Amino acid sequence: MGKIKAKWVSDKDWENIKKTIPTVCVDIIPFRNLQKSEKTLNLEIGLILRLAPLIKKWCFIGGRILKDETVYDAIHRQLRATLGINIKYSLEKDPQPVYVAQYFAKKTSYYGFDPRQHAVGLTYFLNIEGEAKPSGEALDFRWFNGNKMPLPTEFGFKQDRILTKILKLI
């Protein structure tokens, strides 16, 4: 589909939409230096520091899918807007998520938490190369050793739980 021209609704209409309909998003978990054996999994995972939504927390890269935008284009748009143009990655034209995350405005013990809305996050695990330059909502970007991640309280949206589930699938 190529470039997408954003189709915006008024702030008031968007707030009403979020109150009645779940938002579909892409969540991207960058990784590098993956080494896997029968007993161990070594890798680095990239996270952005952002206001989530009001406190600085480590989070996945992502955001909503725009009307008439393919998942491929949404992933590309989010990565470029958040990490800049000097990153490289390989992505199929019709990418399939490694996990489907659910976020609710009410805290639960199991699902993700987003006080702003009910959202469904199509989660992608992408091998990223090149120099990431945080921009947009990213206040910072950092590579973490997969065995030394931030504390659960330092993650936004309860994404530490989602990441734990995904790492068990790999």
Model-derived features with residue positions:
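Acidic, metal-coordinating catalytic segment for phosphate/diphosphate chemistry
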Residues: 1-37, 114
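A structural signal for short, well-ordered beta-strand segments
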Residues: 28, 75, 124-126
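Residue-level signal for short segments within beta-strands and strand-turn junctions
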Residues: 30-32, 49, 128, 145
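Short, charged/polar surface micro-motifs in flexible loops or helix N-caps
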Residues: 33-37, 53-55, 66, 103-105, ...
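Active-site segment of metal-dependent pyrophosphate-handling enzymes
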Residues: 84-131
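NUDIX/MutT-family hydrolases
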Residues: 121-127, 133-169
